[in-house]
């Protein structure tokens, strides 16, 4: 398997899921601090107050990354650690933490990729409306300015927003993630618009404040995978992938085109406007000029895929997985072809290099009697998905890199600590770190630039 010589092999994490130190050094509350302390919100009744204590252990954690051969690492910044109230006074201790983190990465030969927003909105801003507020884009631009000025001399790779669909879909439509709202379609559409406008303002700030910056955006979604390689099934899968279905309950919260076309093409998808234009804020057409900023890469978080084919009526038809089809511990179906067709369809539509910002497998890992963590299913998952990604590269899709989610086991949002995605096993009682077998396997993949796949 051949990957470009400058292919970016890496791993990813996010602030709330690993940092801990929730009440230390001036950090302000986030919506996840409040949400996880409410009864019934997290399956194992846990929270991220301590998480894996990365805030205090980042130096040893980064040394572990270097030992494993990691050369690219995507982390996110806790907005409330920088600005406890979301706006106003800057917490210098928070800035110092991220500055030291970046220095440590660079000292260990690791290139930092900074995600500005990975779901942990300052609670003070939620009380002022959160993503429902039209002021959010400017609040986000102000926060981005502070980060850019503090880190931009050393960090040149930024991702504005991680998984906008989950932010809106899980947090504002279904209410299963912070802030736990179940909004009407009108509010969902407006919140999504404010989020994309915030992305655009952040790109403008980064271009103005960070010389030589490279900027991307990281939506998610389950690619529609052709059931067969027939032209009819390929066309059906492509059509379904980008179709906006009108849903007055959740709006366009989970749609890839609704959250990508404005950013990448400068327009909302026409089929979505049929149902949702009535909910967009005044001046939305003018806002598109800000939302649509030139990007250096288009990030994608891909874990699975769904089969589609041309139905007897000529329309796309979903094909269910048969009994016994492999799934991960979260019951997400394993379909490696998603990491072929997703990048291919997305590049055909957006004509921007693709960066796989997340891909990984959840399992209920445990330490064996020999003191090691054996996870052959994760190795097989990665092997299959990376071969599919390599085929996309061979077929002409410009894929810049692959970031495995996640480097560590961590706090997995509403699932708490029972689900483990990491290459590194974490004992949450002792904070011991153990490299899993998959970590050593991925080490060899990175060392050979994928030639051993």
Short names for language-model regions:
Residues 29-63:
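Aromatic- and Gly/Pro-rich amphipathic surface segment
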Residues 56, 63-66, 96-99, 103:
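N-terminal, well-ordered alpha-helical segments
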Residues 77-90:
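Glycine-rich, proline-tolerant flexible connector loops at the mouths of alpha/beta enzymes
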Residues 6-8, 55, 72:
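A common structural microfeature
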Residues 57-78, 293-297:
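Catalytic domains of carbohydrate-active enzymes, especially glycoside hydrolases
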Residues 1-42, 85-87, 95-371, 377-453:
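Active-site region of glycoside hydrolase catalytic domains
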């Amino acid at each position: 398997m051949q990957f470009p010589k400058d292919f970016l092999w890496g791993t990813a994490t996010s602030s709330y899921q690993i940092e801990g130190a929730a009440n230390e050094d001036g950090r302000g509350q986030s919506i996840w601090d409040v949400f996880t302390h409410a009864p019934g919100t997290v399956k194992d009744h846990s929270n991220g107050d301590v998480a894996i204590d990365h805030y205090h252990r980042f130096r040893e954690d980064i040394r572990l990354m270097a030992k494993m051969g990691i050369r690219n690492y995507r982390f996110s910044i806790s907005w409330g650690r920088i600005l406890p109230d979301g706006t106003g006074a800057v917490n210098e201790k928070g800035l110092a933490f991220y500055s030291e983190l970046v220095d440590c990465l660079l000292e260990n030969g690791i290139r930092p990729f900074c995600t500005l927003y990975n779901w942990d909105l300052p609670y003070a801003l939620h009380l002022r409306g959160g993503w429902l507020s039209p002021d959010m884009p400017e609040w986000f631009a102000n926060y981005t300015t502070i980060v850019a000025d503090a880190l931009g001399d050393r960090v040149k790779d930024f991702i504005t927003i991680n998984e906008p669909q989950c932010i809106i879909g899980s947090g504002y439509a279904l209410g299963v993630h912070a802030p736990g709202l179940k909004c009407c379609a009108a509010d969902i559409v407006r919140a999504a618009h404010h989020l994309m406008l915030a992305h655009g303002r952040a790109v403008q700030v980064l271009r103005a404040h960070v010389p030589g910056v490279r900027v991307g955006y990281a939506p998610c979604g389950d690619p529609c995978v052709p059931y067969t390689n027939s032209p009819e099934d390929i066309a059906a899968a492509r059509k379904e992938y980008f179709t906006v279905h009108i849903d007055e309950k959740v709006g366009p919260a989970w749609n890839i085109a609704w959250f990508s076309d404005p950013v990448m093409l400068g327009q909302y998808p026409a089929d979505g406007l049929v149902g949702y234009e009535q909910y967009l804020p005044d001046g939305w057409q003018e806002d598109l000029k800000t939302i649509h900023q030139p990007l250096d890469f288009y990030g994608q978080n891909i874990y699975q895929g769904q089969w589609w084919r041309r139905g007897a009526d000529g329309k796309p038809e979903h094909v269910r997985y048969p009994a016994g089809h492999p799934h991960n511990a979260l019951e997400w179906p394993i379909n490696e072809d998603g990491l072929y067709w997703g990048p291919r369809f997305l590049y055909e539509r957006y004509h921007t290099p693709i960066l796989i910002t997340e891909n990984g497998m959840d399992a209920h890992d445990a330490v064996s009697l020999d003191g090691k963590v054996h996870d052959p299913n994760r190795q097989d998952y990665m092997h299959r998905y990376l071969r599919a990604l390599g085929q996309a590269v061979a077929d002409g899709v410009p894929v810049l890199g692959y970031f495995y989610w996640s480097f560590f086991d961590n706090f997995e949002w509403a699932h708490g600590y029972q689900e483990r995605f990491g290459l590194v096993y974490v004992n949450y009682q002792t904070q011991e770190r153990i490299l899993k077998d998959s970590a050593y396997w991925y080490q060899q993949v990175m060392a050979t630039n994928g030639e051993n796949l």
